[in-house]
């Protein structure tokens, strides 16, 4: 089969399109003939060596296709099943071998392309909106980078759960995307101090939760915008890592909560994964969730 391989860390130039051995499943594994793959920022981290992985490797952690072979003891899937997955290396190929328990079934009304485009980011948005801080009607949420892959899905899920959404973006085009996803208010942080604008929009009351994937440049102001007992959900650092936080600061700002979650810890069991992926794929299939 053909695959894109990485033999040394570096930029896009280290990606090598080459022949690779056909995968053979071991016990508990399944081979998936891939029809679509998802591209994610984490792929660049693997390629550049920011997240250590053994080399050589086939990058890519998200894909969808059809099961073509199974190893001994596999009961979760069978040959011919349409499946998707997120979180296992090896997607930049015509086929990949994956632990069968990490595969999720695709509904008939969801294409492989749609599944590969939504599983990783969709499950991330799902755990943020239902796990890290379970949004409810009456909540006000501040969502940074609201026009990004996770951001657009998170805005939609927040609205499904009845929250008021204040979104930050950087450009006119992204403002339109965030509004199209349902954001109630959109703040252009390049033109406006988002802290002052959120204070104005909330009559200085603040918000129940901040979802922050930006990190260094937004974190401190986000803490200032939380209501007493509010929650800061820091799930990324596109502007750089956040400095160490003195726990006393959380008390001083109103007994607020801080969490730094990852998808891995919200899909530890097959039941967790089937629940999150199942809801996301159902929303895609029924048109409740728009995937770009």
Model-assigned labels for residue ranges:
Residues 91-94, 169-177, 242-247:
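Short, glycine/polar-rich helix-capping loops at beta-to-alpha or helix-loop-helix junctions
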Residues 150:
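Hydrophobic/small residue at the entry helix of a nucleotide-binding pocket
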Residues 159-218, 269-272:
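Adenosine-nucleotide cofactor-binding segment
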Residues 169, 217-289:
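Glycine-rich phosphate-binding loop and adjacent beta-alpha segment
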Residues 21-38, 48-90:
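Glycine-rich beta-strand-centered segment in the early N-terminal region that forms part
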Residues 36, 45, 84-147:
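NAD(P)H dinucleotide-binding glycine-rich loop of Rossmann-like/cofactor-binding domains
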Residues 82, 140, 164, 230-231, ...:
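Short glycine-centered segments of the SAM/dcSAM-binding site in methyltransferase folds
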């Amino acid at each position: 089969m053909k695959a894109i391989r990485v033999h040394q860390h570096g930029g896009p130039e280290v990606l090598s399109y080459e022949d690779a051995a056909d995968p053979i499943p071991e016990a508990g594994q399944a081979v998936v003939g891939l029809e679509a793959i998802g591209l994610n920022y984490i792929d660049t981290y693997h390629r550049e060596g920011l997240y250590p992985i053994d080399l050589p490797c086939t990058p890519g952690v998200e894909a969808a296709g059809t099961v073509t072979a199974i190893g001994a003891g596999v009961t979760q899937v069978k040959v011919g099943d349409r499946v998707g997955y997120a979180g296992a290396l090896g997607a930049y190929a015509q086929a990949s071998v994956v632990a069968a328990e990490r595969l999720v079934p695709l509904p008939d009304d969801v294409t492989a392309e749609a599944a590969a485009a939504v599983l990783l980011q969709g499950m991330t948005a799902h755990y943020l909106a239902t796990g890290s801080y379970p949004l409810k009607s009456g909540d006000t949420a501040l969502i940074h980078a609201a026009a990004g892959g996770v951001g657009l899905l998170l805005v939609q899920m927040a609205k499904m759960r009845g929250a008021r959404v204040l979104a930050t973006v950087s450009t006119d085009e992204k403002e339109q995307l965030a509004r199209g996803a349902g954001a109630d208010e959109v703040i252009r942080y390049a033109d406006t101090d988002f802290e002052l604008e959120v204070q104005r929009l909330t009559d200085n009351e603040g918000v129940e939760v901040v979802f922050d994937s930006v990190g260094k440049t937004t974190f401190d102001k986000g803490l200032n915008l939380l209501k007493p007992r509010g929650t800061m959900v820091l799930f990324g650092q596109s502007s750089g890592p956040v400095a160490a936080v003195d726990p006393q600061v959380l008390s001083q700002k109103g007994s607020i909560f801080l969490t730094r979650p990852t998808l891995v810890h919200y899909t530890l069991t097959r039941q967790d994964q089937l629940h999150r992926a199942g809801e996301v794929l159902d929303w895609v299939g029924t048109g409740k969730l728009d995937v770009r």
